[in-house]
């Protein structure tokens, strides 16, 4: 439920999901064929429900989970996916009921307890979230997701040192768990510590196809002296999502600010404006590019165009005054 790998670029979910749908379609077909020959296998319905939920096909996911629970009403995996479905629907009450039911059916399984901790954290009930984490760790000290949640709770209170210790413990217990690696990288990035790069790279090895991670890594690279590597990351993202304006905008920004490649910057900002003509940021940076090229006529024309629709846009006001 808790999205620890939150992205910073807009309109990404729609594009990402379309890619995931094409990737997962064959997997869904395979599972569907297996269901035809083994229609009483609840786990198969759970697997297909997960894929449908990933692709935002909520009604299909619900149908599959209902099928799984009609076969085995105490199937914990089915109940956990059902809780995620309710989360997607914003139904906190049913999330709570479902997870409590899972705890009742499987009192030694820490997974529903961790999800209850996630729910409490999202609701701002930090004391309850901590109590659930403590309970999970009492049951099983080897619990990377519990330590990860403890780290997230520390982050919510601003205690990055304790958060870092818990994320490190989570990483030590499960080296292929990408979420704590990402949080560690962001903590070091906020401290301007060069260790951020090594943890981003470690996370990339674990989850090279995680678009949110690739984007965050690219942002780190461009801001820390590796513009060419940042461009490589944006290019890989654009291969998967060629119409995403944020990737082209960031490429343009790298060309403009870090590399001084004005013509390439203009190409990128124009691509953004083709997809999103109302992007003031892209239009302003196109003006900046012209200004940097010494083409003050085109630059001023763009700044004035911005001010006609956004008269309080201070950057454009300053730019016009600067040119004048």
Give, region by region, the residue ranges found by the protein language model.
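N-terminal leader/linker segments that initiate helical-solenoid repeat arrays
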Residues: 4-66, 70-77, 88, 97, ...
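Terminal, low-structured helical/coil segments at or just beyond the last alpha-helical repeat
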Residues: 8-16, 223, 232, 260, ...
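Structural signature of tandem alpha-helical TPR/SEL1-like repeats
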Residues: 21-29, 55-67, 89-101, 123-135, ...
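Structural marker of alpha-solenoid helical repeat scaffolds
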Residues: 37, 71, 105-106, 139, ...
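Helix-start (N-cap) detector for alpha-helical repeat units in TPR-like alpha-solenoids
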Residues: 42-43, 76-77, 110-111, 144-145, ...
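Canonical tetratricopeptide repeat
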Residues: 47, 81-84, 115-118, 149, ...
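Position-specific recognition of the canonical hydrophobic site in helix A of tetratricopeptide repeat
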Residues: 53, 80, 87, 114, ...
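Alpha-helical adaptor scaffolds
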Residues: 118, 189, 219-223, 235-274
């Amino acid at each position: 439920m808790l999205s620890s790998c939150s992205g910073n670029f807009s309109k990404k979910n729609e594009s990402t999901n379309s890619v995931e749908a094409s990737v997962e379609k064959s997997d869904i077909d395979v599972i569907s064929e297996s269901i035809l020959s083994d229609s009483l296998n609840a786990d198969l319905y759970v697997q297909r429900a997960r894929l449908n939920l990933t692709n935002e096909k909520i009604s299909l996911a619900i149908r599959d989970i209902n099928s799984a629970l009609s076969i085995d009403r105490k199937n914990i995996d089915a109940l956990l996916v059902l809780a995620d479905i309710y989360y997607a629907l914003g139904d906190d009450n049913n999330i709570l009921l479902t997870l409590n039911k899972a705890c009742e059916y499987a009192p030694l399984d820490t997974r529903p307890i961790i999800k209850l901790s996630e729910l409490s954290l999202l609701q701002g009930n930090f004391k309850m979230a901590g109590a659930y984490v403590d309970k999970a760790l009492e049951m099983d000290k080897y619990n990377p997701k519990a330590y990860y949640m403890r780290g997230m709770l520390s982050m919510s209170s601003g205690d990055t040192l304790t958060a870092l210790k818990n994320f490190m413990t989570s990483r030590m217990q499960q080296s292929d768990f990408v979420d704590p690696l990402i949080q560690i990288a962001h903590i070091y990035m906020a401290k301007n510590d060069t260790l951020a790069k090594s943890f981003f790279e470690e996370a990339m090895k674990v989850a090279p196809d995680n678009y949110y991670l690739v984007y965050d890594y690219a942002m780190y690279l461009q801001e820390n002296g590796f513009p060419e590597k940042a461009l490589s990351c944006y290019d890989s993202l654009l291969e998967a999502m060629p119409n995403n304006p944020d990737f082209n905008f960031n490429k343009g920004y790298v060309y403009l600010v870090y590399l001084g490649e004005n013509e390439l910057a203009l190409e990128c900002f124009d691509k953004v404006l083709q997809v999103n003509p109302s992007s003031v940021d892209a239009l302003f940076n196109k003006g900046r590019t012209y200004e940097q090229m010494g083409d003050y006529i085109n630059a001023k024309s763009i700044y004035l165009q911005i001010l006609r629709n956004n008269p309080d846009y201070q950057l454009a006001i300053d730019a016009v005054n600067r040119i004048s």
